[in-house]
Amino acid sequence: MVELVITEKRDNPILKRKELKYTLKFENARTPSREEIKEIIAKHEGAQKELIIVESNKQLTGKHEIVGYTKIYQDKASAMLYEPDYELIRNGLKQKEAK
C-alpha cells in the first residue's frame, strides 16, 4: 500500500508549473522508482506523467517513507525551457547525447 501526502503545494504561473512537496509512505512494499512516483503523483493530481519532473527524493532512515519535491508543468515546452538538461534526462524528457 502506497500513500501520498502533499505537505506543500504552490502554483508558479510565471514558470507555468505547480510545485509540490510530499511524503510518500509505502508499508510492506519496496521503495518506489522515479517512474512509479511520477505515476502516483499524476494519478493524485490529474496531470500527465510526461509533464512531471521529480527533482528530489530522500528516503528517511529506518522508515518506509520518502520525502520529495516535484514540479508539474502545464506543457512540455515550458519544462524544456526551464529545467536543466540533467533533470530532463533523469525524468525521460530528453535523451542523453552520445559522445
Curated annotation (Swiss-Prot):
Gene name for this UniProt entry: rps2e
Alphabetized UniProt keyword annotations: Ribonucleoprotein, Ribosomal protein
GO molecular function: structural constituent of ribosome
Transmembrane segments: none
Entry keyword annotation includes Ribosomal protein: yes
Covalent S-S links between cysteines: none
UniProt keyword annotation of Transmembrane helix present: no
GO CC aspect terms: ribonucleoprotein complex; ribosome
Record-given protein name: Small ribosomal subunit protein eS24
Family: Belongs to the eukaryotic ribosomal protein eS24 family.
Any Pfam family hit: Ribosomal_S24e
GO biological process terms on file: translation
Species per Swiss-Prot/TrEMBL record: Thermoplasma volcanium (strain ATCC 51530 / DSM 4299 / JCM 9571 / NBRC 15438 / GSS1)
InterPro entries, A to Z: Nucleotide-bd_a/b_plait_sf (IPR012677), Ribosomal_eS24 (IPR001976), Ribosomal_eS24_CS (IPR018098), Ribosomal_uL23/eL15/eS24_sf (IPR012678)
